[in-house]
């Protein structure tokens, strides 16, 4: 199994074919539906955010899990996806986490069917 690098152009296609590979990524991966509900939350993201992945499935990412991501840049990109079903953007972000700002790089990429999008999260 080849290593999939962060920011890979075809990462969404690989995970659409082989969804179990999300668990083996060396960075966080969160799959959201068009309403922001978490469909998948990999172990790496669980480690980054100190959360049990099973506990966040079915919750709204922006309202229940990461309200600090509801800022203009992060949530604005997601709202574009919500409206169009398409997104492929990479940006730096600082999560307010336990009283500290944690720097991350976000790659938000829609699935080919336009019904869900991945948030790939890498600490910087």
UniProtKB/Swiss-Prot annotation:
The keyword Ubl conjugation does not apply. Pfam families: PAS. One of its GO terms (biological process) is phototransduction. InterPro entries: PAS, PAS-like_dom_sf, PAS_fold, PYP. Keywords: Chromophore, Photoreceptor protein, Receptor, Sensory transduction. Residues 22-85 form the PAS domain. This is Photoactive yellow protein.
